[in-house]
């Protein structure tokens, strides 16, 4: 067995053993650089996942602005994946990506719903990512 083959097999085994995660991106876009916030959130989420051995199986985007997560097509896809048992972790940049601070009860409801299905919510933004657990209310 060559060294390259051994390395490929090791990577494949690590991917099989890692926890499946969905990266959820819902950010307000700047008028001057509309894709910058989205790219930053996605890059940060992928870095977060890689550093923790999580396997991002899908990236889901929603436009920012709708406070009720259940009215967002992307968030409903997150719920669908959680219900099916396809993911163990939802990665978001910060809590307001799920629901804005003024609607925190909606965020807490969604986090509880995910937790009941064995799914963790993890924040990729550096000041919040230091904790091993997401927000639990």
Language-model-detected regions and their locations in the chain:
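Short, structured surface patches at the beginning of a domain
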Residues: 1-137
């Amino acid at each position: 067995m060559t060294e390259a083959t051994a390395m490929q097999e090791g990577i494949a085994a690590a991917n099989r053993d890692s926890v499946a995660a969905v990266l959820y991106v819902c950010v307000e876009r700047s008028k001057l650089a509309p894709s910058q916030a989205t790219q930053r959130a996605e890059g940060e989420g992928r870095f977060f996942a890689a550093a923790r051995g999580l396997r991002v199986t899908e990236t889901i985007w929603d436009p920012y602005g709708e406070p009720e997560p259940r009215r967002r097509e992307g968030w409903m896809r997150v719920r669908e994946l959680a219900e099916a048992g396809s993911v163990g972790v939802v990665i978001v940049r910060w809590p307001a990506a799920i629901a804005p601070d003024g609607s925190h009860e909606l965020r807490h409801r969604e986090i509880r719903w995910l937790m009941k299905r064995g799914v963790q919510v993890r924040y990729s933004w550096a000041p919040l990512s230091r904790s091993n657990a997401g927000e639990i209310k």
